[in-house]
Curated annotation (Swiss-Prot):
Protein's job: Catalyzes the transfer of a dimethylallyl group onto the adenine at position 37 in tRNAs that read codons beginning with uridine, leading to the formation of N6-(dimethylallyl)adenosine (i(6)A).
UniProt site positions, description: Interaction with substrate tRNA: T100
Biological-process GO terms, alphabetical: tRNA modification
Name of the protein this chain belongs to: tRNA dimethylallyltransferase
Cofactors demanded by this protein: Mg(2+)
Quaternary structure note: Monomer.
The EC number(s) this enzyme carries: 2.5.1.75
Ranges that cross the membrane: none
GO MF term set: ATP binding; tRNA dimethylallyltransferase activity
Catalytic activity: adenosine(37) in tRNA + dimethylallyl diphosphate = N(6)-dimethylallyladenosine(37) in tRNA + diphosphate
Region annotation (Interaction with substrate tRNA) ranges: 34-37
Amino acid sequence: MIDLLIIAGPTAVGKTDISIKLAEKLNGEIISADSMQIYKYMDIGSAKITKDEMKGIPHHLIDVVEPHEEFNVSSFKTLAEKSIKDIWSRGKLPIIAGGTGLYINSLIYNYDFTDADRDEKYREYLTKLSEDKGKEYVHSLLKDIDEKSYEKLYPNDLKRVVRALEVYKITGKSISEYTKENEKKLYDIPYNVNYFVLNMNREVLYERINKRVDIMMGKGLIEEVKKLESMGYTPDMQSMKGIGYKEVLFYLNGDISLDEAIYLIKKGSRNYAKRQLTWFRKDKRSIWIDKDKYTFEEEIVDKIIKMVKDK
């Protein structure tokens, strides 16, 4: 069975530094579980790790697709499983590091995307329907077949609405039912999982997030978005809807001021961190590490190593 170490947590909590230190001590390689860092050219807004910051540790699933290409949890699972096997086959420890909870769950709950993968014709039909009758109409189709998704999703979130309708068409089940059934396959995975979630005082975390946004602006986030626009990447693309990118696009289009854009990026990032923590709390397998209780990161690293070895 393959040993798999997972270092998760909210944005700006410090997953990168901890995972690199663990990789150095455990002879590991890191697989990124970040839904934005998979895109090429989107470096500043995604807080993508630099080559120097990697400290010689190989990183996987960073810069793997162009910004116009679609990438989803099924794509991640396929590539991550391939990387895990490759790393393990070379006598090294695969370390998953990131904050996209769905990506992590696709591995440790062995989500099966083969039965309900895609129905392109149905997707095209629903997209055309939204253009003809409006997003609200397509959203209303959920009411009778998947009330939970109907209440949870907004009409403007067309991509997720279409996905929920697609899953129901293929399986006859709501997307939440389908997910629960996949989660029952928990112990069918070929991994010995050690799952840690880093956390810290909420106010301190929010301060770190605000500071990170200021640093991004100083590094040239606006210039990065301008360059992406000049390369032909548009606001309707999945990648350009990421936090930081969509707000700067609003600013560049004259819809909001620069101060408003910065405010919205900070607010959106804080809200995202809150959602991440809520997601991770649902998983009873995860072991939480409160960073506030430690003076040095090395203490956290040593604690994780001890817990892994004592398991």
